[in-house]
Amino acid sequence: MKVVQGDYRGEGLKIAVVVPRFNDLVTSKLLEGALDGLKRHGVSDENITVVRIPGSMEAIYTLKRLLDLGVHDAIIVLGAVIRGETYHFNVVANEIGKAVAQFNMTSDIPIVFGVLTTDTLEQALNRAGAKSGNKGFEAAMVAIEMANLRKRLRRDVFESDSNGR
């Protein structure tokens, strides 16, 4: 039996972080957490690309462009979609979630979903470092692990299958 998994060594990895300005009180804290996680685990400043966008819906376009460039080992998308009085919350939350899932099914580069979908600003702030940890930091850990898993799958599974069969 072969077990393949990633690890948390970020040295040499190139990571993009897409973060909206909308709900900046929350998203800036998510970004701080993500950058802290990446740097603590060895991803250097020169290998981190932060892309600031207006809102979460613009992440879909931005993710597609970053995937087309193909220079990153993983991409993190952050955001905070907070329920309001209209149906807009549902549209934004559903569309960004569907887009990330679709890109993950069709791309070779892992995209990590770090978009908070909450009922209140307080819930969002709690998940951005106030009480419940920082989901940006957690997204950084997932990005590093998935980037390393991607490399290992190529090396340990693909190469051994193509050489051995």
Swiss-Prot record:
Domain of life: Bacteria
GO biological process: riboflavin biosynthetic process
Enzyme class label: transferase
Pathway(s) per entry: Cofactor biosynthesis; riboflavin biosynthesis; riboflavin from 2-hydroxy-3-oxobutyl phosphate and 5-amino-6-(D-ribitylamino)uracil: step 1/2
Binding site for (2S)-2-hydroxy-3-oxobutyl phosphate: E85, T86, R127
GO cellular component terms attached to this protein's record: cytoplasm; cytosol; riboflavin synthase complex
GO MF: 6,7-dimethyl-8-ribityllumazine synthase activity
EC number, UniProt record: 2.5.1.78
Database matches in SUPFAM superfamilies: Lumazine synthase (SSF52121)
Amino-acid positions noted as binding 5-amino-6-(D-ribitylamino)uracil in the UniProt annotation, renumbered to this chain: F22, S56, M57, E58, A80, V81, I82, F113
Keywords assigned: Riboflavin biosynthesis, Transferase
Reaction catalysis annotation: (2S)-2-hydroxy-3-oxobutyl phosphate + 5-amino-6-(D-ribitylamino)uracil = 6,7-dimethyl-8-(1-D-ribityl)lumazine + phosphate + 2 H2O + H(+)
Active-site residues, Swiss-Prot/TrEMBL: H88
Function statement: Catalyzes the formation of 6,7-dimethyl-8-ribityllumazine by condensation of 5-amino-6-(D-ribitylamino)uracil with 3,4-dihydroxy-2-butanone 4-phosphate. This is the penultimate step in the biosynthesis of riboflavin.
Family assignment from sequence similarity: Belongs to the DMRL synthase family.
Annotated NCBIfam families: lumazine-synth
Name of this protein: 6,7-dimethyl-8-ribityllumazine synthase
